[in-house]
């Protein structure tokens, strides 16, 4: 199902409304779009505001919309409007969207306390509802470059819906050091089932979204002198929303 997500931010100058939406990978290259504006919530689809079907994924409506204005972005395929793939969107209150996130609790490693700050993020439709979710990496305050010695706190990945609902949390565990060179992740629909997976490197002790543990939960391979895992196995894991238990885990990398 297609919807116009991340759409409808009223411009600061308030003399127009800028609308943007996604062109999905499942849509053909010749897909066009019509935009309808409805001035009353829950009313009809209103009036079409573009003259010809658009071959872009953004549009500026020279109209000062009210809070209850709704927009409908309708795909046009072979000259036919695809109304079965349409959802209504409303204006944001600001030029950005506030999404509440849940900061992990402070923790300690080797007796030293660390805290968390949000780091890298990526987007994908994790649950197949046509709306993006956000995958966010939490970096501990003692994160280190791969060349640096020292213990780090545990790296954490969260998945959030746009209203702030947390879908899952993955704790990378003690055998994945926290740092930009150690945890990268990819969000993509690898198996083409309409729901994106999250692929990343894991190790013994990584806790998946359902609380299950990958590998041996009791193993800690961190070298006392530098905090690095130089001998323990590493895995490539894909996690899906419907299989929070680590959808697929490859053998030792």
Predicted regions and their residues:
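Surface-exposed loop/edge segments in extracytoplasmic proteins
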Residues: 41-51, 166-167
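Extracellular low-complexity, O-glycosylation-prone stalks/linkers
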Residues: 31-43
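Structural beta-strand segments of beta-rich domains
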Residues: 17-19
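Single conserved hydrophobic/aromatic residue that forms the stacking wall/gate
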Residues: 1-8, 13, 243-246, 250-253
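Beta-propeller-forming repeat regions
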Residues: 23, 28, 34, 54-245, ...
């Amino acid at each position: 199902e297609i919807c116009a997500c991340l759409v409808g931010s009223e411009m600061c100058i308030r003399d127009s409304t800028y609308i943007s939406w996604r062109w999905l990978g499942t849509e053909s290259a010749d897909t066009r779009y019509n935009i309808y504006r409805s001035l009353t919530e829950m009313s009809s689809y209103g009036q079409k505001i573009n003259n010809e079907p658009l071959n872009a994924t953004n549009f500026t409506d020279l109209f000062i919309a009210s809070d209850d204005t709704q927009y409908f972005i309708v795909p046009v395929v072979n000259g036919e409007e695809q109304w079965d793939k349409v959802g209504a969107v409303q204006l944001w209150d600001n030029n950005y969207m506030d999404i509440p996130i849940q900061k992990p609790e402070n923790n300690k490693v080797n007796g030293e306390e660390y805290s968390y700050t949000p780091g890298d993020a990526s987007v994908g439709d994790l649950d197949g509802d046509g709306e993006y979710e956000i995958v966010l990496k939490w970096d501990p305050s003692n994160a280190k470059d791969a060349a640096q010695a020292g213990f780090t706190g545990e790296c954490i990945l969260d998945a959030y819906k746009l209203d702030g609902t947390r879908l899952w949390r993955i704790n990378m565990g003690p055998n994945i050091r926290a740092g930009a060179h150690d945890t990268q992740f990819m969000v993509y629909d690898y198996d083409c089932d309409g729901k994106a997976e999250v692929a990343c490197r894991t190790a013994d002790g990584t806790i998946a979204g359902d609380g299950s543990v990958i590998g041996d939960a009791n193993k800690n391979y961190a070298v006392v002198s530098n905090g690095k895992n130089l001998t323990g196995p590493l895995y490539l894991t894909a996690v899906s929303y419907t299989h929070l238990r680590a959808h697929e885990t490859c053998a030792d990398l």
